[in-house]
Amino acid sequence: MAKSFASQGDLSEKTISFTEIGRDLWAFTAEGDPNTGVIIGDDSVMIIDAQATPRLANKVVEKIRSVTDKPIKHVVLSHYHAVRVLGASAYDASEIIASQTCQSMIHERGQEDWDSEFARFPRLFEGHESIPGLTWPTITFSDRMTVNLGRRRVELMFLGRAHTAGDIVAFVPDEQVMFTGDIVEYHSACYLSLIHISEPTRPLYT
């Protein structure tokens, strides 16, 4: 049975899992809550989606430190939604990466989305006082970007409108693993916000 996503009536803590899904590739999950991907390279770590608050992000960091002491240098934002990005400051990464469209949506809708998700998902925003503000990318790209973590290559790709107008995926060629943000759901219907109904399957076949 699929786990329900956090809501106003969902105040119980979820069981955290930290699962290796490929060589030095990890998935931080918590029974249907927003997840985080972890890519460990030769010399550094990349985070895919940052969690809703620094409090939750620190739980990710704790799990990372159980498997590596390499520095976290990159945080990748798959899209702009508050529950996935506002924990970014906890990683102390030198670069925060997103699509140009995602950056535009943070400008246009970031505060509105923060206010909305804060009201709808109170459990995810426990400890919200530590959020320093909206999460702003330091690097953006239009279509594709390659990040080298030593010998490990990560391909970041904007494949068209999907869950939002600016979603990206992260592909790790050496393990054939892709992190998809909210474009793909497991045992659950997609969370519909600004989804583009006519286009969401196209990126999966690109």
Which stretches of residues belong to each language-model region?
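Metallo-beta-lactamase
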Residues: 104-159, 173-174
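Ligand/cofactor pocket segment of small-molecule handling proteins
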Residues: 143-145, 149-194
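Active-site environment of divalent metal-dependent phosphoester hydrolases
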Residues: 54-55, 80-86, 103-106, 164-167, ...
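Short catalytic-loop micro-motif centered on adjacent basic/acidic residues
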Residues: 27, 46-49, 73-76, 155-156
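Conserved beta-strand hairpin/beta-sheet module of binuclear metal-dependent hydrolase folds
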Residues: 17-63, 168-182
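Single conserved hydrophobic/aromatic residue that forms the stacking wall/gate
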Residues: 195-199, 203-206
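Divalent metal-coordination and catalytic microenvironments
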Residues: 24, 39, 49, 64, ...
